[in-house]
């Protein structure tokens, strides 16, 4: 690696420097997630595929992680300016995929939701990709339209219209969780870019009203809200998943029942290896494990926002917004997943980044980290007076 005080000769390629602490934190989350996916999925794997299939989800998760690392390495080599230049085309691709997933006979339906496109031995979830795409597009949009950031029709309305279209497509799947995350990404980027406080707070006041309407018009969403306040009122139906998640947390106590010793994962807690893996972790590793995971995510967010602030100081507004948008995305999704597992929020169907089972989320999150590392590397080059 090169020291900050030196520059590379013109005929010598510049070797990338990585934020070792950031990369190490992500690898720790991936590693711990892999262990917990295996532990949480043993029972369901053998129930679905027979005895001797306990490694099924472990093998698939490991392959997703390797694929994510491979794709991430490729994306790291792409200059940040490329993502900005092609953000329109990426947006078109994202909207097209959201339309395709709604076509009967093409999409893969699970539990009444059409969120997946079958791809042979696996499937792809377009809403995961859309989180990254709309983040990049919004960052590019607010930079290009900086002169109109306080203008409702020329600056605010177009991005609001886009958010409405994307939200409607997601709600047709339905996927309220992804809708909430994407709305938060867009609003946070616009806020960080300095949009009019009057328009921002006006929209913030409108969001709870829209969320309330979306909850009221769908009885199952209202049931999830009611289950938060008293899951024990109907522990065998509407409160079933939450009561078993809370039991898992209670059994874990301070130090857990031991890795692999969870009772709730034995076909009691639904989605134990995906949306509710955090509850299994709490049962097996206890309060100590919960604090460890929360601390890792907190440290990861600190490093992410540091990259964003550095980019802003170096005059790279697009890179700064992308980096901080990634921080908002991953931080909010982790918060929602943990909150759902603890009974603080209604069930949303959102995975825990880097840890829950799922190929789409692992690969897309890896791409996001690769772009973040690219921003960090370009920051380092700019401090030396070099171009990426």
Swiss-Prot record:
The chain crosses the membrane at residues 20-40, 56-76, 90-110, 117-137, 152-172, 176-196, 197-217, 285-305, 325-345, 352-372. It comes from the Bacteria. GO terms for biological process: cell wall organization; FtsZ-dependent cytokinesis; peptidoglycan biosynthetic process; regulation of cell shape. GO terms for cellular component: cell division site; plasma membrane. Pathway: Cell wall biogenesis; peptidoglycan biosynthesis. Its EC number is 2.4.99.28. It catalyses: [GlcNAc-(1->4)-Mur2Ac(oyl-L-Ala-gamma-D-Glu-L-Lys-D-Ala-D-Ala)](n)-di-trans,octa-cis-undecaprenyl diphosphate + beta-D-GlcNAc-(1->4)-Mur2Ac(oyl-L-Ala-gamma-D-Glu-L-Lys-D-Ala-D-Ala)-di-trans,octa-cis-undecaprenyl diphosphate = [GlcNAc-(1->4)-Mur2Ac(oyl-L-Ala-gamma-D-Glu-L-Lys-D-Ala-D-Ala)](n+1)-di-trans,octa-cis-undecaprenyl diphosphate + di-trans,octa-cis-undecaprenyl diphosphate + H(+). Residues 41-55, 111-116, 173-175, 218-284, 346-351 are periplasmic. It is found in: Cell inner membrane. Residues 1-19, 77-89, 138-151, 306-324, 373-388 are cytoplasmic. It holds the Pfam family FTSW_RODA_SPOVE. InterPro entries: Cell_cycle_FtsW-rel_CS (IPR018365), FtsW (IPR013437), FtsW/RodA (IPR001182). The keyword Transmembrane applies. Peptidoglycan polymerase that is essential for cell division. PANTHER family: CELL CYCLE PROTEIN (PTHR30474), PEPTIDOGLYCAN GLYCOSYLTRANSFERASE FTSW-RELATED (PTHR30474:SF2). This is Probable peptidoglycan glycosyltransferase FtsW. It comes from Nitrosomonas europaea (strain ATCC 19718 / CIP 103999 / KCTC 2705 / NBRC 14298). The lineage of its organism: Bacteria, Pseudomonadati, Pseudomonadota, Betaproteobacteria, Nitrosomonadales. The gene is ftsW.
């Amino acid at each position: 690696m090169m020291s900050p005080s030196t520059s590379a000769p013109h005929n010598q390629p510049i070797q990338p420097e990585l934020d070792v602490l950031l990369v190490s934190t992500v690898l720790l989350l991936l590693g711990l997630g892999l262990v917990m996916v295996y532990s949480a999925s043993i029972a369901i794997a053998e129930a679905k595929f027979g005895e001797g299939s306990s490694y099924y989800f472990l093998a698939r998760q490991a392959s997703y992680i390797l694929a994510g690392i491979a794709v991430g390495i490729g994306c790291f080599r792409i200059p940040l300016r490329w993502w900005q230049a092609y953000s329109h085309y990426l947006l078109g691709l994202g909207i097209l995929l959201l339309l395709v997933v709604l076509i009967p006979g093409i999409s893969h339906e699970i539990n009444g939701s059409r969120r997946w496109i079958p791809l042979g031995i696996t499937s792809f979830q377009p809403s995961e990709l859309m989180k990254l795409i709309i983040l990049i597009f919004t960052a590019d949009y607010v930079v290009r339209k900086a002169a109109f950031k306080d203008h409702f029709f020329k600056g605010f309305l177009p991005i609001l219209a886009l958010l409405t279209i994307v939200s409607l497509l997601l709600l047709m799947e339905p996927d309220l969780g992804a809708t909430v995350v994407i709305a938060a990404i867009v609003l946070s980027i616009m806020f960080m870019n300095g949009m009019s406080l009057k328009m921002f707070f006006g929209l913030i006041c409108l969001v709870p009203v829209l969320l309330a309407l979306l909850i009221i018009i769908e009885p199952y969403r209202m049931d999830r809200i009611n289950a938060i306040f008293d899951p024990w009122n109907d522990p065998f139906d509407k409160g079933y998943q939450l009561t078993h998640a809370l039991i898992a947390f209670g059994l874990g106590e301070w130090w857990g029942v031991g890795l692999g010793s969870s009772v709730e994962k034995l076909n009691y807690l639904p989605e134990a290896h995906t949306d509710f893996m955090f509850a299994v972790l709490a049962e097996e590793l206890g309060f100590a494990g919960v604090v460890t995971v929360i601390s890792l995510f907190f440290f990861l967010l600190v490093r992410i926002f540091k990259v964003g602030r550095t980019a802003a100081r170096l005059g790279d507004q697009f890179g700064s917004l992308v980096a901080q948008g990634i921080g908002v995305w991953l931080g909010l999704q982790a918060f929602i997943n943990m909150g759902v597992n603890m009974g603080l929020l209604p069930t949303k169907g959102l995975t825990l980044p880097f840890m829950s089972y799922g190929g789409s989320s692992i690969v897309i999150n890896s791409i996001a980290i690769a772009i973040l590392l690219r921003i960090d590397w370009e920051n380092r080059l700019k401090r030396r007076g070099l171009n990426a």
